[in-house]
From Swiss-Prot:
Residues involved in FAD binding: G11, G12, G13, H14, A15, G16, V123, S178, Q367
Organism listed in the record: Caulobacter sp. (strain K31)
InterPro entries assigned: FAD/NAD-bd_sf, GIDA_C_N, MnmG, MnmG-rel, MnmG-rel_CS, MnmG_C, MnmG_C_subdom, MnmG_C_subdom_sf
GO cellular component, one term: cytosol
Subcellular location: Cytoplasm
Protein name: tRNA uridine 5-carboxymethylaminomethyl modification enzyme MnmG
């Protein structure tokens, strides 16, 4: 095996797997360096994929021929479409995942991937030559060369585990932290900080009184993650639901000093939307109970993940408070929970390609950028790996705007605003969420992926067939119409306004369904469920989509105003020192990106625009 590649990916978690695959799919000779082959694709925390906002990211990864959706469908054991009762724009596909099935399927995919080598070593340092990255060095001094390197270290950069008074240097339980890489990033001058996340105890399902619990079943009709998945063959399971009690809260409150944060042993900021049970007891002191989902980790695994009680108190206290919950009175613990602190790089150090501004050729993806979650990591990994491959080939980078993808929203948030706490995706972060639905991710992105070279032949063929079907259905829906008289004669209540109405206009009327319209136009009954769903959504959102497209046009006018990469903000008049510092730090590429930087006022934008126009006219 050669010691020279086009792209090196460091880290075999969710970001690293997607980065390595995307780079290889795009035609770059790729090397994935990871400390253990057997932990590639490991789900280190909760055994689930998707959710609100997160499910959108999984669908977008899939639309670009990434792995998470397809692999998830080989391991999904409890599918649920969240927000089903609400509009399609905010629905989120989610599934419990069999950890073992997921890991095995991911490894089978990567270990046989064209253009991809996987080597199990611990990287200790980067090779930097003439101010650019040139490869990586392992703990024994072996050299691996590449002009592009993607760093996906997760929680391993100077990771420290906290469990009561116990403090262990580790990237996760059983794995050593990455000290050398963290030291190298500090030495290069990267602006870095400290974050924290946590995980709950793992319970022995054989010791849970399941018959005393409320149970939550999977959806009768599973909604797959991948557009390529036609059916789910994995057996579906139920999850249990229990609750914390007043006694639970009393035990935690009395022993709060054992917590890493409340005991003063950890300074990293934890995720706001996934608080520890200690945080819940303190922040929501008026609540006497919190819901806890008991999620089996696999079909042939008795391990249960108690979602909602991540903690860093001692093992003794964990067992005490767990046994105060209904159904867990006699529970035994397989592995106790813990908090983990780790270093991250301020994502304002990055371009929208996820390449670092400070060290050309180095890309960062995943928790190293201050995000939390498998889906956020996977989406960043895909974009970093793809852009690294495109850069090696001398091609234009892949950057999605906020109106094109949730991936674009996330990366723009990160590189423009930075983070002060672990970032997670929500539908509320997207201004154009009626357009950015989970159901149309392939319609938005697969053609882009084909042009970028990251979409393979199987997906290309499937997408071509689906695209042709949608075009034919939409053409038919626009081509046939009813006059008000015709509509009323066939049983539809329509105003006599002289307006002919096509299929979409008819569907927008109360109590009109495609099944009813099929009695008028029988061809509708031949449409596939996918086509029927898309037409129904487009009809329901028609007026709103038109208004949102107007908003997109206004957004793009600002995005089209490019700012010079070498702009000297010291020469721009009427800017405060604070605004100058923020602009110089982020180095926005467009006026729109500048507008999204905290503290940049409309007056500052006007001054900036005037300066750029004068410079162009000079």
């Amino acid at each position: 095996m050669s010691n020279t590649w086009d792209v090196i990916v460091i880290g075999g978690g969710h970001a690293g797997c997607e980065a390595a695959s995307a780079s290889a799919r795009a035609g770059a000779r790729t090397l994935l360096l990871t400390h253990k082959r057997e932990t590639v694709g490991e789900m280190s925390c909760n055994p689930a994929i998707g959710g609100l906002g997160k499910g959108h990211l999984v669908r977008e990864i899939d639309a670009l021929d990434g792995l998470m959706g397809r692999i998830g469908d080989k391991a999904g054991i409890q599918y649920r479409l969240l927000n089903r009762s609400k509009g399609p724009a905010v629905r989120g596909p989610r599934s419990q995942i069999d950890r073992k099935l997921y890991r095995e399927a991911m490894q089978a995919e990567l270990f046989s991937h064209v253009n991809l080598d996987v080597v199990a070593i611990a990287v200790e340092d980067l090779i930097v030559e003439d101010g650019v990255v040139a490869g990586a060095i392992d703990g024994e001094g072996a050299i691996y060369r590449a002009p592009r390197v993607v760093l996906t270290t997760g929680t391993f950069l100077k990771g420290v585990i906290h469990q009561g008074e116990i403090r262990i240097s580790a990237g996760r339980v059983g794995d050593a932290p990455s000290i050398g890489l963290a030291d190298r990033l500090y030495a290069l001058g990267f602006d870095m900080g400290r974050l924290k996340t946590g995980t709950p105890a793992r319970l022995d399902g054989k010791t849970i009184a399941w018959d005393r619990l409320e149970m939550q079943a999977a959806d009768e009709q599973p909604e797959p993650f991948s557009f390529l998945t036609t059916r789910i063959d994995v057996p579906q399971i139920q999850c249990g639901i229990t609750y914390t009690t007043a006694e639970t809260h009393k035990i935690i409150a009395e022993r709060l000093g054992e917590s890493a944060v409340y005991g003063g042993r950890a300074t990293g900021i934890g995720p706001r939307y996934c608080p520890s049970i200690e945080d819940k007891v303190v922040r929501f002191a008026d609540k006497t109970s919190h819901q806890v989902f008991l999620e089996p980790e696999g079909l042939d695994d008795d391990t249960v993940y108690p979602n909602g009680v991540s903690t860093s108190v001692s093992a003794e206290t964990q067992l005490l408070f767990l046994r105060t919950m209904p159904g867990l009175e006699n529970v035994e613990v397989i592995r106790y929970g813990y908090a983990i602190e780790y270093d991250y790089v301020d994502p304002r150090e990055l371009y929208p390609t996820l390449e670092t501004k400070r060290l050309p050729g180095l890309y960062l993806a995943g928790q190293i950028n201050g995000t939390t979650g498998y889906e956020e990591a996977g989406a960043q990994g895909l974009m970093a790996g793809l852009n690294a491959a495109l850069a090696v080939q001398g091609r234009e980078p892949a950057v999605f705007a906020r109106d094109e993808a949730y991936i674009g929203v996330m990366i723009d948030d990160l590189v423009t605003r930075g983070v002060t706490e672990p970032y997670r995706m929500f539908t509320s972060r997207a201004e154009f969420r009626l357009i950015l639905r989970a159901d149309n991710a392939d319609q938005r992105l697969t053609d882009r992926g084909l042009a970028l070279g990251c979409v393979g032949s199987v997906r290309a063929e499937a997408w071509a067939a689906k695209k042709a079907e949608l075009e034919a259905v939409r053409a038919f829906a626009r081509s046939v119409t009813l006059t008000p008289a015709e509509a009323n004669r066939t049983g539809f209540k329509v105003n006599h306004d002289g307006q002919r109405r096509d299929v979409l206009a008819m569907l927008a009327l109360p109590e009109v369904t495609l099944d009813r319209l099929a009695t008028v136009w029988p061809q509708i009954s031949t449409w596939s469920p996918m086509a029927r769903e898309q037409i129904a959504i487009e009809a329901a959102y028609a007026g709103y989509l038109d208004r949102q497209r107007d908003d997109v046009e206004a957004f793009r006018r600002e995005e089209d105003l490019r700012l010079p990469a070498d702009l000297d903000y010291g020469l721009v008049g009427s800017l405060s020192n604070e605004v100058r510092e923020k602009l110089a730090r982020v180095k926005p590429l467009t006026l729109g990106q500048a507008a999204r930087i905290e503290g940049v006022t409309p007056g500052a934008l006007t001054a900036l625009l005037a300066h750029v126009r004068r410079a162009k006219a000079a």
